[in-house]
Each structure stands twice: as C-alpha cells, then as structure tokens.
C-alpha cells in the first residue's frame, strides 16, 4: 500500500518521524512536503498533492496529512472526489456500551482513506499509536456502509 504524507510547518517535525517509522515497518511512503521547516508555508500546498494522489486510487492508497489542528487540512482534502479524510486527536472511546475507538470506526464504517492529524495535540508516541491503529483497521465491507458511501460518492452539487 502506498501512503502519501504531507504537512505544513506545524506538523513538519512529527511528519519526518512518522515517515521514518512507517518506512521501517515496510510501508511505501511518498513524501509530498514540506521538505523543510518554513513557518510561513501554507497547508494547502502540501495537502492538495496528497489528496490528489489518494483521489486517483481511493481504495489502494492512503494519505496522512498533518497541520496544527488537522481541521483545515481535512477540509481541503475532502474537496477531492472519493477522498474520505477524517480528523483525529488521539484515543477517544464513546461513553455508551461500545469499546471501539473513533479511529477504528472511521475505517470500519466510513472507509476513511486520509487521516488528518492535529500535530499540536499529539506526542510522537500517541501519533504512532493512532496511525498504526488506523492503518491496520480494515473497512468492514458491510452492505449498509457500502450503500452509504455510494450515496456520498453520488452527491452532485448544482
């Protein structure tokens, strides 16, 4: 599986550590920038190339994007067809009778293919835990989830 990664200055340091870790685990990682720390860079410059690649192969590739909060990054990524970007800040379990972490649900139910991380809210350890959980959780393939995703893909904006 190809993993495309992009980040602005706010996530640059964590991005570099993430790339190293994922490569050591055997993943094919394609860095879409930033390639150096620049506090004046703009996240769309690095998110758009990731989203563009994942949009071309939404079921065979994944993307990880980092920014200060991950919110703007996800908004930009979700402009692309077939991209299902989700924001995450670390472990979160519901208060109801369910033990599933939200990041697990994003894969099982929504087949998320881009993970947008708020770098200001992660340690290196918590980021790696979240990324590994996301990468290793398969889409359930349940008919109801396939049907819902097809409805989303079929939305036409006039």
Feature annotation, model-predicted:
Residues 6, 10-11, 91-92, 96-158:
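C-terminal binding/interaction regions
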Residues 20-28, 82:
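Short helix-loop-beta junction
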Residues 28-40:
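A short beta-strand-loop structural module common to alpha/beta enzyme folds
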Residues 12, 69-76, 96-99:
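Short glycine/serine/threonine-rich phosphate/pyrophosphate-binding segments
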Residues 50-89:
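Helix-adjacent hinge/juxtasegments
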